[in-house]
A protein has these predicted regions:
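AMP-binding/adenylate-forming catalytic domain of the ANL superfamily
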Residues: 223-226, 548, 579-604, 617-646
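Conserved AMP-binding/adenylate-forming
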Residues: 132-181, 288, 297-303, 342, 376-503, 509-513, ...
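Adenylate-forming
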Residues: 149, 191-210, 326-330, 346-392, ...
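Structural core segment of the AMP-binding/adenylate-forming
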Residues: 159, 163-237, 344, 352-353
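Conserved AMP-binding A3 loop
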Residues: 115-120, 248-249, 256-280
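AMP-binding/adenylate-forming catalytic core of the ANL superfamily
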Residues: 146, 171-196, 211, 330, ...
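Conserved AMP-binding/adenylation subdomain of ANL enzymes
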Residues: 277-297, 307-347, 362-363
Length: 648
């Protein structure tokens, strides 16, 4: 298969302005490194790992209250030791060299009109919350749990915790009580910050009873502090303190926050990231891969229950500002976020592949009137972006927009592969492997392959890998999660292909692979074909084993209003899969469903649904509290009772 023609190339002027160009020139001047291409730069960054991360420290002037003894102490994974002996402050770097009158963030929600906070305001709010927490006895190592939405007060609360050395953990207010208790209960927070309610899709949701249930159930909580968001009253009286913002010098590996896995098949894994590792990774990612420049305004739709919120806050390490939105991105229609882009002058619009697909299916024309003159980049993540999604962005937004699809994980709070502002964009491909990320595709024997689909592995340590899972005293849960297949090598659980030119293609989760007649295929290839059928809005495909046969592969589809799953549509779906994927991967059956089950972060629930249809008890296969639409499971539970798919 030949190389697809680029959909976009940076102009010479744009490539010259990119921070990564300045960085490469600096490497040549200070280290004599003449790296003529991005691929050469990437290879150097993973071959000379210590030298690369030392260059990031020097180029971005990372400051330490105590200097590190070396870049890497223990090198083996898991347990690589980064910058032993160093002390620094993540929060101090966020606020460093910021003009108090410049804008730090812009915000909007279904409850509030668009507004903005200057750096002076953000610092003032952060100082007041930090003083309030200190008055409650919060100090270094204490956990502060937040049941807060994506609003400026939440950013300030996180930075307040970081300044004190307290460990932050957040859950979005739409999470149910059981889901939040399953998360916060594991880390035993001292303080719970929570809202009274929120508005979503035009409806008000009072969460006071849920908050009380959480506070009563998480027995470590000594103090509940309420933020009146729904009623507009703000922080409860007496909470905010006074005084200047101070920054506690902390060990490089001091925990910054606890994130969580989806928890679809058990208690969510509490993933702990060190403040120094996140600092280095976010400096690299925001500057060199997002190309966040002074004056830029970056947005990524997220809730506080998804790592993209933490990722977006990291952009504040640059001289760009960020844009926050709290609410339903489809209310009152799919034009809401595009209108926000126009009103806030966004330069980068970050979203999910599913949102782009929805806009495309709805026939949306976000820039039909030329309302997005400042938009220079669009980012996509969450799942592989279909080729049609690439084409739709360029058809709608024009040839000058840089579209970067990116893939990573909560586990590392960053992307392994994705945007490179100086490389061309090709349909269906991610531009390159991230600097310092030794991404490879491995076959089952542990051999690196190019031009073939393999397991996505990371063969060298990264600073933002988890320092541990909370409560995993012997590290067994951590090792089992990433290192059980290839000892000492991080196996992420995705299928990936590295092309001969260094781009990447993600094919979906390797634990939900379709295997037909010995030919393996990622589910994303089938979804790309199916979602190209105009009447299909969403889909779920499974490969179910059967005794004595090659298995049974059903396809479940969500149709647009008014569409009917008749013989003609079934034939069209199968024909598209046969032509765009492979004749081997035409489904045995096509069925209509109302919704595809998804996690709270939007991921399709392939493996748990497969387990239900193979006879696993629903409560063991999936935690309903971890789902965005738990009622979508009911269809599959009923279906599993109709027949035994494993034997029929």
């Amino acid at each position: 298969m030949g190389s697809p023609e680029p959909l976009w190339k940076p102009s010479p002027a744009r490539a010259e302005r990119a921070t990564i160009t300045r960085y490469r020139r600096w490497l040549e001047q200070t280290r004599g490194l003449k790296l003529g291409s991005y691929e050469e730069l990437w290879r150097w960054s993973v071959r000379d790992l210590e030298e690369f991360w030392l260059s990031i420290i020097e180029f971005f002037d990372v400051r330490f209250s105590r200097e590190p003894e070396k870049v890497l102490g223990r090198r083996e994974m898991p347990g690589a030791q980064w910058l032993p002996g160093a002390r620094c402050s993540y929060a101090e770097h966020i606020f460093r060299d910021k003009s108090p009158d410049e804008i730090a963030l812009r915000h909007a929600s279904e409850l509030r009109e668009p507004g903005e906070w200057s750096w002076g305001q953000l610092r003032e709010h952060t100082a007041a919350i930090a003083a309030g927490l200190r008055n409650l006895g919060v100090g270094e190592g204490d956990r502060v749990a937040a049941y807060l939405p994506n609003i400026p007060e939440t950013v300030a609360a996180f930075l307040a915790c970081a300044s004190l050395g307290a460990i932050w953990s957040s859950a979005a207010p739409e999470f149910g009580a059981r889901s939040v208790i399953d998360r916060f209960g594991q880390i035993e927070p001292k303080v719970l910050l929570a809202i009274d309610g929120y508005r979503y899709g035009g409806r008000d949701f009072d969460r006071r009873q849920v908050v009380r249930e959480i506070a009563d159930s998480v027995r470590s909580v000594q103090r509940l502090v309420t933020l009146g968001y729904l009623d507009g009253s703000g922080w409860e009286p007496g909470f905010l303190g006074s005084g200047d913002l101070e920054f506690s010098p902390l060990d490089f590996a001091h925990p910054l926050w606890v994130l969580y896995s989806s928890g679809t098949t058990g208690l969510p894994k509490p993933i702990v990231h060190g403040q120094g590792g996140i600092l280095l990774e976010q400096l690299k990612k925001s500057h060199l891969h997002l190309d966040a420049q002074p004056g830029d305004r970056l947005f990524w739709f997220s809730t506080t229950g998804w790592m993209m919120w933490n990722f977006l806050v990291g952009v504040l390490l640059t001289e760009a500002s960020i844009v926050l939105y709290d609410g339903n991105p489809g209310h009152p229609d799919l034009g809401t976020l595009w209108t926000l882009a126009q009103r806030t002058g966004m330069t980068c619009f970050g979203t999910s592949a599913a949102f782009i697909s929805s806009c495309m299916k709805a026939g949306l024309e976000p820039a039909s009137g030329g309302e997005l003159p400042n938009l220079r980049a669009v980012g996509s993540t969450g799942s592989p972006l279909a080729r049609e999604g690439f084409r739709w962005i360029y058809d709608q937004l024009g040839p000058d927009v840089w579209l970067f699809s990116t893939s990573g994980g909560t586990d590392v709070c960053t992307a392994f592969v994705g945007g490179v502002p100086t490389l061309p964009v090709r349909e269906g491909e991610l531009q390159g492997r991230a600097l310092g990320c030794a991404v490879e595709a491995w076959d089952p024997e542990g051999r690196s392959v190019v031009g073939e689909v393999g397991e996505l592995v990371i063969s060298q340590p990264m600073p933002s890998m988890p320092i541990y899972f909370w409560g995993d005293e012997d590290g067994s849960r951590y090792r089992e999660s990433y290192f059980s297949m290839y000892p000492g090598i991080w196996r992420h659980g995705d299928w990936i292909e590295i092309t001969p030119r260094g781009t990447a293609i993600i094919y979906g989760r390797s634990d939900s692979t379709i295997n037909r007649g010995g030919v393996r295929m990622g589910t994303s290839e089938i979804y790309r074909a199916v979602l190209d059928v105009p009447d299909v809005l969403d889909a779920l495909v499974l490969d179910l084993p059967r005794e004595g046969t090659g298995g049974w592969m059903p396809l479940f589809v969500v149709l647009r209003d008014g569409a009917k799953l008749d013989h003609g549509l079934v034939a069209a779906i199968k024909r598209r899969i046969r032509e765009e994927a492979s004749p081997r991967h035409v489904p045995d059956d096509v069925r209509q469903i109302a919704e595809v089950p998804r996690t709270l972060s939007g991921k399709v629930l392939e493996v748990p649904v497969k387990r239900i249809l193979m006879g696993t008890a629903p409560e063991q296969a999936a935690s309903r509290e971890s789902l965005a639409n738990p009622e979508a499971l009911d269809y599959f539970v009923a279906l599993a009772q109709e027949r035994d798919f494993a034997r029929d």
